[in-house]
A protein has these predicted regions:
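S-adenosyl-L-methionine-dependent methyltransferase catalytic module, highlighting the catalytic core
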Residues: 3-6, 24-37, 153-163, 167, ...
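Local beta-strand N-terminus motif with an aromatic residue
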Residues: 90, 140-141
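Short catalytic micro-motifs in class I SAM-dependent methyltransferases
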Residues: 147-151
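Conserved N-terminal segment of class I S-adenosyl-L-methionine
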Residues: 2-134, 229-256
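Alpha-helical membrane segments in multi-pass integral membrane proteins
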Residues: 142-143, 162
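Hydrophobic beta-strand segment of the Class I
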Residues: 96, 143-144
Length: 256
């Protein structure tokens, strides 16, 4: 079973994987029955999670077999639950590259006017290139755009586009892979071979690997940055049970 999951996750195109995830849900509760780990998003317990990631960034016991959440999804969910997100007044939400684990939840929230966007995802309402968003200025109260900026040619241009379509007083979360051992972002446009990109940037289709300067890059695009640190902002958090990355922070990008 583990071999089958790994093969599917690493070889199938994302749109097809999204469709097949509904089948995974039928198998997971039986194949991974247990209570060693817990996913706060689907609120299910399992014997273990699945492994995930490239050979360079491989992690064991991180992928929920039911809703396919990873460490970053579970951390974002914990932030949203402790904030006023689900109880706030009507929110215009733009969700770029919508994650399968969040899509059905956000879709049914009565306080969310929910718009999804992507290059090709079958989940998306809109399809566009993030470098030039075909929407007016000051439209959205909240924008989620997670694990996208490491894939784009000009991340600063994309950040300024996110800033442009966000309302004044709005906020967004744009998670990216971060090497917390590096002070600065590493990118080299001469590295084009997929294997070399995986070696340098942790994945074959990544164009850069962000460092601890990532929030400064968001500031350069105009955002004010607030930091959610689960170690200090959440009490009695069981990192091991939920299989979270103890170093990961959530940067909230605010348009003043």
């Amino acid at each position: 079973m583990k071999t089958i999951y790994k093969y599917l996750l690493n070889t199938l195109p994302r749109p097809l994987l999204i469709r097949l995830s509904y089948v995974f849900r039928l198998v997971a509760p039986i194949a991974f029955k247990g209570s060693n780990v817990e996913c706060p998003v689907c609120e299910r317990k399992f014997r273990k999670f699945l492994s995930y990631g490239s050979d360079i960034a491989h992690r064991e016991n991180v992928l929920c077999p039911y809703d396919l959440t990873l460490e970053r999804h579970r951390l974002l969910w914990l932030y949203l639950k402790q904030s006023n997100f689900f109880n706030a007044k009507k929110i215009n939400l733009l969700h770029i590259a919508p994650e399968q684990c969040f899509y059905p939840i956000f879709k049914k929230q009565p306080n969310l006017n929910y718009t999804t966007a992507d290059l090709e995802s079958p989940l998306a309402d809109l399809h566009f290139d993030l470098h030039q968003i075909p929407l007016e200025e000051n439209v959205f109260d909240v924008i989620f755009c997670n694990h996208v900026l490491e894939h784009v040619e000009d991340d600063h241009q994309c950040m300024t586009e996110l800033y442009r379509v966000m309302k004044k007083g709005g906020w967004g979360i744009f998670q990216v892979p971060i090497n917390y051992e590096s002070e600065t972002t590493y990118e080299d446009s001469t590295i084009t071979d997929p294997k070399e990109r995986e070696k340098h940037f942790w994945q074959k289709d990544h164009l850069r690997l962000y460092g601890k300067d990532y929030p400064s890059k968001l500031k350069e695009a105009g955002f004010k940055i607030e930091i959610f640190n689960p170690r200090t902002d959440l009490k009695n958090l069981n990192y091991q049970k939920m299989r979270l990355n103890p170093d990961e922070l959530v940067y909230i990008a605010i348009k003043q």
